[in-house]
């Protein structure tokens, strides 16, 4: 709890521009805050955690870790300006498809689930990378959005783990995510 509070304070701090190292702090804060600025990113990150909880065992750590690794690759592509087509459609599809998979409730091989989630991560990372504020440190910004994404994955994982004993509730959460994804895509 203390570490969450500390991260929140650091993320919300607005450093004076005359201070040395301000790009590191503002870069981290901008990166950490970015995933929380839109329902599309929040839904996708939480859904990765829910899906990992549903799959269980190794997927509980490989799915979030693989997602974050590929999201950082996507972020680098976005920061360098290398184009990825249909980024917004890929982000919306990630929410809808992850929601359907959670609602459907069929087990996946962890490697196949990680490949699917990682392909979605490229779109999310690209969006994060394209929106890096001018003057932000690339490393600090990237660490910020990676840690925020991890926090959302862990929230989904904890929620999903709590719901697995009542699998009907987990499937219903998948339906809710799917409907929210449709709203993001077409609303």
Model-derived segments and their meaning:
Residues 2-187:
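Membrane metalloprotein/metal-transporter helix-bundle signature
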């Amino acid at each position: 709890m203390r570490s969450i509070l500390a991260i929140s304070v650091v993320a919300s701090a607005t450093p004076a521009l005359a201070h040395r190292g301000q790009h590191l702090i503002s870069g981290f804060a901008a990166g950490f805050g970015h995933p929380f600025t839109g329902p599309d990113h929040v839904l996708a990150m939480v859904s990765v955690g829910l899906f990992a909880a549903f799959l269980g065992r190794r997927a509980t750590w490989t799915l979030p870790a693989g997602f974050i690794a590929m999201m950082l690759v996507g972020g680098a592509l976005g920061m360098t300006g290398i184009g990825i087509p249909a980024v917004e459609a890929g982000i919306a599809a990630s929410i809808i498809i992850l929601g359907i998979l959670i609602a459907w409730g069929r087990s996946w091989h962890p490697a196949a689930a990680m490949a699917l989630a990682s392909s979605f991560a490229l779109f999310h990372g690209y969006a994060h990378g394209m929106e890096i504020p001018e003057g932000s440190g690339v490393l600090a910004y990237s660490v910020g959005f990676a840690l925020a994404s991890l926090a959302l994955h862990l929230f989904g994982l904890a929620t999903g783990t709590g719901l697995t004993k009542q699998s009907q509730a987990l499937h219903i959460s998948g339906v809710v995510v799917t409907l929210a994804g449709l709203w993001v895509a077409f609303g």
